[in-house]
Amino acid sequence: GVSASFLGEEYREGLQNENERIKALNNIKIELDEIDTYCEERKNNYVKDRNVLKYLLDNSDYAFDSIDNLVQSSPGIGFALNDYREFQPPMNRYNSIINEGTIKFIESDSVKQQLSELHNTLYAYLKSIVDDEKLIQQKLSLYLAENYPKVILLEKYDTEKKTYYNALSKAVNNDEILKALMYTKYRKMGIKNYFLDGYEEKLIELRNRIEKVLINKGAK
């Protein structure tokens, strides 16, 4: 009787652990889908902002037309210079399974390792690059405000894009310091986009691995 009772309890505990395991993996999978959507939005805007700077620095005959196709207003041009975009993917579900200790139910060491790499290592790299860009952006904004206040004041929705572009382009072409600050920000944006691509590759690889585990468990 004791032996049967013990085996029954062991079976129930194993079943409960398996349910917790599937629940944890499903939660991670849901959040990875959310992060994927977030990264696509970030990538589109990161690339757009960098292209605005590219065309301003190029100063080619088609530069304004190219920028005009990218942004809807003068502030859209100014944003690429005077602001930055954060990188804050949704991580509540991951943080919960860490804080609650339910990460222990995930058997696969490779899944746990890739989760840590994505949410700690690669995330830290991206945050560091965004912080660096923020410092450059602050220097750039301050330099513009101190040396080209009229350009700053033109950065509003009722200013024609062409008017704002012409004023900004004139400033850039006649000021090596301004151009150097813009180029530094442009270069940092390129590094950010490179690491975002790597982050997305790791995310997709991890999501595919989790999907296979769930399929093998008959949970999907």
Q: Which residues does each PLM region occupy?
A:
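Hydrophobic membrane-insertion alpha-helices, especially the h-region
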Residues: 1-6
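Long, hydrophobic alpha-helical segments that serve as membrane-spanning/inserting helices
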Residues: 7-220
